[in-house]
Amino acid sequence: MTDNVSAVILAGGASRRMGTDKSMLKLKGKKMIEIVIESISDIFDELVIVSNSPEKFDYKNNDFKVVSDKLTHLKRSSLRGIYTGLTEISNEYGFIFAGDMPFISPELIKAMISEMRKDKWDIIIPVISGHYEPLFAVYHKNCHYTMKQQLLHENFKITDSLKEFKVLELTDNYCVQYDEYLASFFNINTPEDLEQARKYLGKTE
């Protein structure tokens, strides 16, 4: 288990493009959210799920906490989910994950946490092919104070948050050392993505 870092999974609810809650889609007979949990449960001693529909996660004997989005009078956004998760963790850092990432690399997670321990970073975030990956990133818990002010000003861009913090950007070349095909950053946005994931696993439902 990793001391001082909690896992936060954002399971935001219905997707416009998928027409359903992506975290509830199935691969190999398991819900997407279950695959994510299994991928990371041996690494973290605290797991928080942020959801607009917490009743979907009312599992018996679970080892995680489910919380509802805060600031619900504001536009739904990933930044709002990150903010909510960081306010709920008991550890100093939160590793944020999307609930629709079925190919997470534990080795890359551990490497990123190791980088966090080398210096007092506020955020450690991969930049893959020039694009930030804020839903596979490490955040200091105290980032939520600045994020709240940004949300209250109705600015929902996560990249704008980065300007306010001490940020370590991890390049493609860094990440491929621990995740050869960068599969950790594959998420399910469309039915075509779901079919691609099923083919990757070599089995359809």
UniProtKB/Swiss-Prot annotation:
Compartments in which it is found: Cytoplasm
Gene3D superfamilies on file: Spore Coat Polysaccharide Biosynthesis Protein SpsA, Chain A
Keywords, in A-Z order: Cytoplasm, GTP-binding, Magnesium, Metal-binding, Molybdenum cofactor biosynthesis, Nucleotide-binding, Transferase
Reactions catalysed: Mo-molybdopterin + GTP + H(+) = Mo-molybdopterin guanine dinucleotide + diphosphate
Pfam families for the chain: NTP_transf_3 (PF12804)
Cofactor(s) named in the record: Mg(2+)
GO BP: Mo-molybdopterin cofactor biosynthetic process
Main subcellular location: cytoplasm
EC identifiers of the protein: 2.7.7.77
GO MF term set: GTP binding; metal ion binding; molybdenum cofactor guanylyltransferase activity
InterPro entries assigned: MobA-like_NTP_Trfase, Molybde_CF_guanTrfase, Nucleotide-diphossugar_trans
GO CC terms of this entry: cytoplasm
Keyword Cell membrane: no
Annotated GTP binding sites: L10, A11, G12, K22, D69, D100
Signal peptide: none
UniProt: Mg(2+) binding residues: D100
Superkingdom of source: Bacteria
Record remark: domains: The N-terminal domain determines nucleotide recognition and specific binding, while the C-terminal domain determines the specific binding to the target protein.
Entry similarity comment: Belongs to the MobA family.
Function: Transfers a GMP moiety from GTP to Mo-molybdopterin (Mo-MPT) cofactor (Moco or molybdenum cofactor) to form Mo-molybdopterin guanine dinucleotide (Mo-MGD) cofactor.
Protein name: Probable molybdenum cofactor guanylyltransferase
Organism from which the protein derives: Natranaerobius thermophilus (strain ATCC BAA-1301 / DSM 18059 / JW/NM-WN-LF)
